[in-house]
Each structure stands twice: as C-alpha cells, then as structure tokens.
Design a protein with these regions (language model features):
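Extracellular/luminal beta-rich ligand-recognition
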Residues: 53-110
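Acidic/polar low-complexity flexible segments
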Residues: 48-50, 59-66, 74-80, 137-186
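Short, well-ordered beta-strand segments enriched in hydrophobic/aromatic residues
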Residues: 16-20, 24-45, 123-131
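Beta-strand-rich interaction surfaces with strong enrichment in secreted/lumenal proteins
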Residues: 4-7, 16-20, 110-118
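Active-site/ligand-binding surface loops and adjacent short beta/alpha elements
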Residues: 100-120, 178-181
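Short Pro/Gly-enriched beta-strand edge/turn motifs at strand-loop
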Residues: 1, 49-55
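A short, structured loop/turn motif at beta-sheet edges
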Residues: 22-27, 73-78, 118-121, 134-139
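Extended, acidic-biased charged interface segments
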Residues: 109-150
Length: 186
C-alpha cells in the first residue's frame, strides 16, 4: 500500500494508506484508515461489511468532508479524470481537458461498486469501476492518490506527493504513479 502524507504535517493520530489495481478494464482503488481515536468527522460510525453496486447517483462537493480520491491522467495529453467517493457510498467522477479545466458536459455513465470492511480493526474501503467508458483515458496513465479529511484538527489534504506551496491534487507534478493494464502501482 502507498502511504499518504498530509500537506500541513499536522500532528494527527491518523494514517491513510491507499492502493489501486487495474484488471482488464476494472479499476479497484482501496484505502486503509488508521484512526484509532476516531478523529474523522462524517466517517463514523463506520459501517463494515457493506457492499453497494450499480449505476449510483453521483454527488457534488464530496471534498468538503472526508473524501477519498484518485486522479487518472493521460501521459501524452493533459486530459485527466478525478474520482471522489466516501464511506457512505457517495461518489462522483469529473473529466478535465487540461489543468483544472472541467468539462461540464461530461456525464458519467459508470457502474460502480463500493465495499467496506475492517482489516485488523481499521476501516478499509474499496471502490471498483469499469473504466472502459472513459474514452479519453489512454494507458499507460499517470495516477495521483489523494484524500481530504475533516476531523478534530480541521481539514487535511493527503497525497503520495505534494509539490506546490499549497495543496493541489490537480498539479501534474503530483501524478507520480503509473496505471497500466493488469498492474497496480509502480
């Protein structure tokens, strides 16, 4: 698993690890949350052993609370997708033609699956989506794993890499992982 780091380097008792796996066109993104003091808001009570699937209704502004994210970018162009989901099975996907240039006409038609469980007493979330319908995504692609947490210490921004003077998951310098068919992180 990939350990995510807070931008602010706050003294929190939280650790977040993430991973991804592409098998054919099925992308599974997973997050393991170590929050023994249950500091996260809008996350507890954590409902383990839960599975929800189908064409779920996407929601806006998930990043205003605890939200798990993955960014998938083409290696040749600046097109990229941003997936957001939370422990309540709320999700969304956005398409950008370039840095922060959201294509408003993009309407996701994706079958998604969210599953939750406990791993050694810690919350584990997995989000699976068939990426075949993401026409502008070409493999191999670049990946940025990220999380926004809202807790007792306020809002924190987590990623495997932070490059700028402020947290910016869209910054292409943070897309440091590779997505290839039938492979996970590299």
């Amino acid at each position: 698993m990939i350990l995510l780091y807070t931008f602010e380097n706050k003294k929190e008792n939280i650790r977040i690890s993430s991973d991804f796996q592409l098998n054919g066109s099925m992308l599974t993104v997973s997050y393991l949350v170590d929050d023994k003091d249950q500091e996260l808001e809008d996350f507890y009570p954590f409902e383990a052993a839960r599975e929800i699937s189908g064409t779920l209704f996407p929601l806006e502004n998930l990043w205003t609370t605890t939200c798990f994210e993955i960014f998938l970018k083409n290696t040749v162009t600046n097109d990229y997708y941003e997936f957001n989901f939370n422990s309540k099975a709320e999700w969304n996907v956005f398409y950008f033609s370039d840095y922060r240039k959201r294509v408003e006409s993009f309407k996701p038609d994706l079958d998604v699956k969210l599953s939750t469980r406990q791993v050694n007493g810690r919350p584990f979330l997995a989000f699976t989506v068939d990426i075949r319908s993401l026409a502008n995504l070409k493999l191999p692609g670049q990946v940025n794993m990220a999380t926004v947490t809202k807790g007792k210490a306020g809002i924190s921004y987590w990623s495997q890499k932070h490059s700028g003077q402020k947290p910016d998951f869209h910054d292409f310098k943070n897309f440091s992982l590779i997505l290839n068919s039938n492979e996970g992180k590299k």
